[in-house]
Amino acid sequence: MGFLKLIEIENFKSYKGRQIIGPFQRFTAIIGPNGSGKSNLMDAISFVLGEKTSNLRVKTLRDLIHGAPVGKPAANRAFVSMVYSEEGAEDRTFARVIVGGSSEYKINNKVVQLHEYSEELEKLGILIKARNFLVFQGAVESIAMKNPKERTALFEEISRSGELAQEYDKRKKEMVKAEEDTQFNYHRKKNIAAERKEAKQEKEEADRYQALKDEVVRAQVQLQLFKLYHNEVEIEKLNKELASKNKEIEKDKKRMDKVEDELKEKKKELGKMMREQQQIEKEIKEKDSELNQKRPQYIKAKENTSHKIKKLEAAKKSLQNRQKHYKKRKGDMDELEKEMLSVEKARQEFEERMEEESQSQGRDLTLEENQVKKYHRLKEEASKRAATLAQELEKFNRDQKADQDRLDLEERKKVETEAKIKQKLREIEENQKRIEKLEEYITTSKQSLEEQKKLEGELTEEVEMAKRRIDEINKELNQVMEQLGDARIDRQESSRQQRKAEIMESIKRLYPGSVYGRLIDLCQPTQKKYQIAVTKVLGKNMDAIIVDSEKTGRDCIQYIKEQRGEPETFLPLDYLEVKPTDEKLRELKGAKLVIDVIRYEPPHIKKALQYACGNALVCDNVEDARRIAFGGHQRHKTVALDGTLFQKSGVISGGASDLKAKARRWDEKAVDKLKEKKERLTEELKEQMKAKRKEAELRQVQSQAHGLQMRLKYSQSDLEQTKTRHLALNLQEKSKLESELANFGPRINDIKRIIQSREREMKDLKEKMNQVEDEVFEEFCREIGVRNIREFEEEKVKRQNEIAKKRLEFENQKTRLGIQLDFEKNQLKEDQDKVHMWEQTVKKDENEIEKLKKEEQRHMKIIDETMAQLQDLKNQHLAKKSEVNDKNHEMEEIRKKLGGANKEMTHLQKEVTAIETKLEQKRSDRHNLLQACKMQDIKLPLSKGTMDDISQEEGGSQGEESVSGSQRTSSIYAREALIEIDYGDLCEDLKDAQAEEEIKQEMNTLQQKLNEQQSVLQRIAAPNMKAMEKLESVRDKFQETSDEFEAARKRAKKAKQAFEQIKKERFDRFNACFESVATNIDEIYKALSRNSSAQAFLGPENPEEPYLDGINYNCVAPGKRFRPMDNLSGGEKTVAALALLFAIHSYKPAPFFVLDEIDAALDNTNIGKVANYIKEQSTCNFQAIVISLKEEFYTKAESLIGVYPEQGDCVISKVLTFDLTKYPDANPNPNEQ
């Protein structure tokens, strides 16, 4: 990795003459008093690395020469050179020389162009434009105070994506323009297509004109033929109908007699049916009563079955428990039997071993025969002497054995009692476990029930609140809709207004906090009546844009020009000169200051409002406005409520209609608010409807709570039963057994005391008997070499006693195991009996359930049968009722027939008369039709006769009442009857029409068709003979427009591709930098804070195009909660800013990093952390050159460069260097104290 080795300065700023500064170590600190020239050294490094003059704290390049600022330049040139060193490569020198008013760049003493110079530096990782190698004084605080938008600008500068911003905007404009051109050509093409369609229609109309004339003639013939054909058909039909009616009159008389006979028969049938219906109703009542009696029996049987099923479930549960007990007891007994067999086996093995040992010992202890005889003789003699004592001892032995047996019995009973107590303890433990489980289940169930109840309450409250809120929202929505309806404002923004709104949003986004908005959007008249007056006074300033400064305004104007927007008026608050408000005007009667009737937000736009309103006064009417304006010794600017304005100059202006239109813009603001409220209420209504739909969930929760409550009730009952019955009984029995066990102790102790007392007496008797034996066996004992005869006997019987003792132990073990085995057998038998008993109970309950189910089914079957019978009877009743109704209906019909028989006769006679009249009318109609055809010159196709045979006289006139007139009419009809018309040209469909309505419809259709054709013919003017030429012209024009549209579409596509390409390049540059910084910043912040709990994270406001909006930067200081950056302390802000600086530096890092007083705002703790971090990084990542005034910081450096001033015409900086690597750090780790 390369590093900055030396800096050579000549006549640069405060450095007079030539000075070589260095060498620079990996971590070098520059120190010195204020004003000594430390920052000038940093400026020198910046200068040689190509920094702009404006960032070097001078106005012109010449001002960088020593003494130039005071008018005494030390020379006409100055330069700074830098020696850059890399491992394994030659040192390179970069120099920048001030010659006259320009810079000259050199690499290794060779003059190069600026771009070559920059490229070489970029190869080393030094980016001049991004300034990734230095941090100026105050830059840390500046970064800490940056807002998200300024942070984005910083990233744009670092990533160099900002270089593409101008191209990005240009491509975007080209894309938008190309899309607009495409849309324009599309609409143009659409209009020409409409013209082409119109030309086609003109040609088609000319072709149709002649065809329509021919159609009219054919339609006239068809209509007349249709009328005549159906007239003749109707005449023929009427003749047949007349003959038919005469026959019907004869038949009607015979039908009347038959109807009377039928009526009598129907009356008899109806009487029979009604009697049957009454019988069925009686049977239905009986079955209904029977069913009401059977239902309770079925319900009772069902309840018995349900109850028995529950008992069966409980019995099965008990059976399972007893079976578990039985299996456990059986296992215990098997273990005891195994133990018994083991003891018996051990006893047998012992007996066999003793037998073998006794045989071997018997051979060793055998006396001589004479000695044996002597022993037996002496033994007999001793027995005789101690006979009394032996009898007394025998009596003691008998008593002792009896007491020992009694002691063994008591101890056996004690063991049995202890076993029973253990059994009861097991049962009590089982009861307690069951109680614990039940209590645990009850507790859990209660908690669950409480949760369910709570949930039910919450859901109920939520649903009820939702219902109430829905009603409220609907009322509010209705009110809003009414208000919107009353407003009757249909605002459709023009593209011009939309464009202005877009530009307004853009400059607000570009200059957040500096652009406040349009004046009309920031203020509102206090009352509606003032709207017109305020509108008049504000005038063109209504749409003026308020900004904080003149610079912001000029920047906005430049932006609008670039966007080709319309001219806008800006009111910069720092530039406006406003006269103070005349307080005396507030005392005038009948007038108010216009500024006093306007509400505005934010408060600091008041200056702009004062500028727009001045000292203008608003009055209620024109007279007051004129009086106050011109009536006093001093003129005032006044306005009436109707908008009449009186200027001080005497000019009076109105324009009420135009003002009202402008004033409506105040109302439009209210309408916008109403629309926003409507949208908000609609969204809330959707949310509340979702909550209301939780009713189904509420019902489910209620059902679950009910089920849980029932199970809890049963569990509590079971718990109570277990506590009060099973546990209490077992505790009582255990207490009784413990009482019995307590009585065994005293009895056993009493027996033991008696046995011990008797043993002492027996011991005294034995001692007396021993004295007798010693006297008798004295000589014999000397002979065999023992002290006394007992020693001989004990030696012989000792073995037997040990064997007897061992045998007794085996016997006791067998006795104990036998007792336990007998007890377990008894308990096992009890368990087996209980299992058997529960099996019998289960079997019995199952049999009873089977019987009860059969009984239930039997009752159900009876009910089903009864219900089926009842339903059958009801069906019969309905059928019979229907039959009776039908019969009544039939009788009613017969009565109607009979009652109307005479009327029918009269009716038939009337019909005959009517038919004759119709026949006469049809003949008259035929005559009129033929006469009309002759008069209208409609050529009818005739097969017999000619058009001349048609009479010109009127036929069937109402005035003709004489016999001669009738005869003449009949003669005309007879002559015209000879004319036969050829209906071959008449369509068959028209001939087939039969019904009068159908004939009328067809006739109307033909007439309508004829009328339409005639109407169309009348409307159509003479055909356009140039229609074809026009069509050809329009087709050519359409093709031309289509080509233009296609070309515009391709241009739009190309423009979009170009825009997307530059957008992608800009995004890639920005995102590469952002992702690198965002990835590293948390780790760097942790390292700076020396605490892994510290957190730092970056987030773009616009992830799609992050360079268009701000970047949020947040830190969580160690041991603290999350707080916004503004709420962090000064030191925390500085550490956060340093983390961001180092993270930015990690993206395309420069080999060295020059930092000017970054520790200014840090306390000692944070200084140590930052210094240690820089020291760590300088060893492997970058060379650090830091200007610092704080000892805690620069003592961590590897070398020091001291800058001190010498006074002259201006300050002269001198430099000292000091290598700290020779002096090891006494405390390398600041955390180790």
Curated annotation (Swiss-Prot):
GO terms for MF: ATP binding; ATP hydrolysis activity; chromatin binding; DNA binding; mediator complex binding; protein heterodimerization activity
Q: Where can this protein be found?
A: Nucleus; Chromosome
Under SUPFAM superfamilies, the record lists:
P-loop containing nucleoside triphosphate hydrolases (SSF52540), Smc hinge domain (SSF75553)
Q: Which residues form a coiled coil?
A: 104-124, 163-503, 660-935, 991-1068
Record keyword Calcium present: no
A GO term (biological process) for this protein? DNA repair
Query: Would the keyword Metal-binding turn up in this protein's UniProt record?
Result: no
**Modified after translation how?**
Phosphorylated upon ionizing radiation or DNA methylation. Phosphorylation of Ser-957 and Ser-966 activates it and is required for S-phase checkpoint activation.
Similarity section? Belongs to the SMC family. SMC1 subfamily.
This one is known as: Structural maintenance of chromosomes protein 1A
Species of origin reads Rattus norvegicus (Rat)
